[in-house]
UniProtKB/Swiss-Prot annotation:
Its EC number is 4.2.1.9. This is Dihydroxy-acid dehydratase. Pfam families: ILV_EDD_C, ILVD_EDD_N. It comes from the Bacteria. Homodimer. It catalyses: (2R)-2,3-dihydroxy-3-methylbutanoate = 3-methyl-2-oxobutanoate + H2O; (2R,3R)-2,3-dihydroxy-3-methylpentanoate = (S)-3-methyl-2-oxopentanoate + H2O. Belongs to the IlvD/Edd family. GO terms for molecular function: 2 iron, 2 sulfur cluster binding; dihydroxy-acid dehydratase activity; magnesium ion binding. The active site is at S468. [2Fe-2S] cluster binds at C119, C192. Its cofactor is [2Fe-2S] cluster; Mg(2+). Pathway: Amino-acid biosynthesis; L-isoleucine biosynthesis; L-isoleucine from 2-oxobutanoate: step 3/4; Amino-acid biosynthesis; L-valine biosynthesis; L-valine from pyruvate: step 3/4. Mg(2+) binds at D78, D120, K121, E442.
């Protein structure tokens, strides 16, 4: 066993002595040591219940004849961090999580790992670590939150609350109505109830094969979560016995399938960023062109909030992720069904008995929302290395208009609230990329303000930052190269005409190459917004969004 490094041989007497101080007995040294990587954090609703969750996982691991050791990671609640400097720490926290898990697991030579994530950056951070460490691993997330209901009976979620702010600001609802939405938008523990980033990543974790069937859709408060925990411990023991590791599971084909599900469900645009980072950790050469190819061959079968009023509980009721995959498998060339997963079985075996139970929630191949995926990669002279739009969350497929430029999210939000943005405008929020932000903050507050004011179909928003999975409308993010790297978005001037063509996958500014070259020569890189601490270091090391915004190792040659 891998853990023999710290528990076998006469020279490991000091190590065993320390381990006995934690409560271990001599007989425990013949059992696999299992890292329980938890993320219990009281300020995050999606993680508040994970303390008890972790206890159940440890019981299941002991029952399977193994020895559990629990530790915690950090986490950031993107909703609470939204709209202020806290959002700059969100994406960088992914790297800290990956590094911290790597540190604990490799320092103590565990034989296997069960990861308990749930919310936005915690799930991909742990997945990155699992691929980096490469020991047998199973993921069991904390599960989605249920949707809420206002006193009037309206179904609401977190995106409803954000959009309610814009609606109140523009006089469309009263303060009492906003308070009613606030009080009911997040009714329980769990990851926010729509197809936002957390649920998107937990669904992708399931199809990748790192998590068990049901992981993405079973609610946090559903007793079936406890059954998943028991299964996870049993399956982990099998993975250890068969030496099946994350890099055996997360192949190029598995990532294709993850993006296929993403396209079928119209997941968060953040999935592109995180899954590209996973590919980097797995040592795979996977780029945005391949994502685009998946998007072109996969139909859009589900519209989940914010694209509709359906939520994760509805997906679960309609058959869950397995039912979506089973329907997708009917189309040749969409899925790779014979690859291994954390169940010890193939994807084909995992979904064999699944079926759609509600075809209003999960559409059939014969009745898709669209013939192509709910996420699309755009390119053009404004995004030479690519940009991402959640095409399933807008009915507008082509938009052209003059740009209104803001050099930060705060500046943009103030401008929107002051009425500086009108129907037909293309809002540009720049210098908010991985390096420029730093941290590539999400733009949920500006998009929600625009939607809440009734301009969601009449104003486009482009940024080198990110969008929350709760964002909708004509929102194009991850523009690469970013402004801080001298990308074309940095060269735009007020009133330039910008064209977004979703069907043709184009993102262009109607300015000649000669004029852009002239502007590039005159452009001066702004001073970094942050020069000290973690964000200062992050800004110096982070790479572009089109490569997952991972950190690069400095070249000291």
């Amino acid at each position: 066993m891998r853990s023999d490094m710290i528990k076998k041989g006469f020279d490991k007497a000091p190590h065993r002595s320390l381990l006995k101080a934690t409560g271990l007995k001599d007989e425990d040294f013949d059992k696999p040591f299992i890292a329980i990587c938890n993320s219990f954090i009281e300020i995050i609703p999606g993680h508040k219940h994970l303390n008890e969750f972790g206890k159940l996982v440890k019981e299941a691991v002991r029952a399977a004849g193994m020895v559990p050791f629990e530790f915690n990671t950090i986490g950031v609640d993107d909703g609470i961090a939204m709209g202020h400097i806290g959002m700059r720490y969100s994406l960088p926290s992914r790297e800290i999580i990956a590094d911290s898990v790597e540190t604990v697991v490799n320092a103590h030579w565990f034989d296997g790992m069960i990861c308990i994530p749930n919310c936005d950056k915690i799930t991909p951070g742990m997945m990155m670590a699992a691929l980096r460490i490469n020991i047998p691993t199973v993921f069991v997330s904390g599960g989605p939150m249920a949707a809420g209901k206002t006193s009037k009976g309206d179904v609401v979620d977190l995106s409803s609350v954000f959009e309610g702010v814009g609606a109140y600001q523009s006089g469309k609802i009263s303060e009492e109505e906003l308070k009613d939405i606030e009080d009911h938008g997040c009714p329980s523990c769990g990851s926010c109830s729509g197809m936002f980033t957390a649920n998107s990543m937990n669904c992708l974790c399931e199809v990748l094969g790192l998590a068990l069937p049901g992981n993405g859709s079973i609610l946090a408060i559903d007793p079936r979560r406890e059954e998943l925990i028991k299964q996870a411990a049993e399956k982990l023991k099998i993975l250890i016995e068969r030496d099946i590791k994350p890099r055996d599971i997360v192949t190029e084909e598995a990532i294709d399938d993850a993006f296929a599900l993403d396209m079928a469900m119209g997941g968060s645009t953040n999935t592109v960023l995180h899954t590209l980072a996973l590919a980097q950790e797995a040592g795979l050469d996977y780029d945005m062109n391949r994502i685009d190819a998946v998007s072109r061959r996969v139909p859009h079968l589900c519209k989940v909030s914010p694209a509709s009023n359906w939520h994760m509980e509805d997906i679960d009721r309609a058959g869950g992720i397995s039912a979506i995959l089973k329907e997708m498998s009917r189309k040749e060339g969409v899925l790779h069904l014979d690859r291994i997963t954390a169940t010890g079985q193939t994807l084909r075996e995992n979904i064999a008995h699944a079926e759609i139970k509600d075809k209003e929630v999960i559409h059939s191949l014969e009745n898709p929302h669209s013939e192509e995926g709910g996420l699309r990669i755009l390119k053009g002279n404004l995004a030479k290395d690519g940009a991402v739009i959640k095409s399933g969350a807008t009915e507008v497929k082509r938009f052209e208009g003059p740009c209104v430029i803001f050099n930060s999210q705060d500046e943009a939000l103030a401008g929107i609230m002051l009425g500086k943005v009108k129907k037909g405008d293309v809002v540009i929020i720049r210098y908010e990329g991985p390096r420029g932000g730093p941290g590539m903050p999400e733009m949920l507050a500006p998009t929600s303000a625009i939607a809440g004011m009734g301009l969601g179909a009449d104003v486009a928003l482009l940024t080198d930052g990110r969008f929350s999975g709760a964002s909708r409308g004509i929102s194009v993010g991850h523009i690469s190269p970013e402004a801080a790297a001298g990308g074309t978005i940095a060269l735009l001037e007020q009133g330039d005409i910008v064209c977004i063509d979703v069907e043709e996958r184009l993102l262009e500014v109607r300015v000649s190459d000669e004029e852009l070259d002239k502007r590039k020569k005159e452009w001066k890189r702004p001073e970094p917004k942050v020069k000290t601490g973690w964000l200062g270091r992050y800004a110096q090391m982070v790479t572009s969004a089109n490569t997952g915004a991972v950190l690069k190792i400095p070249n000291f040659d």
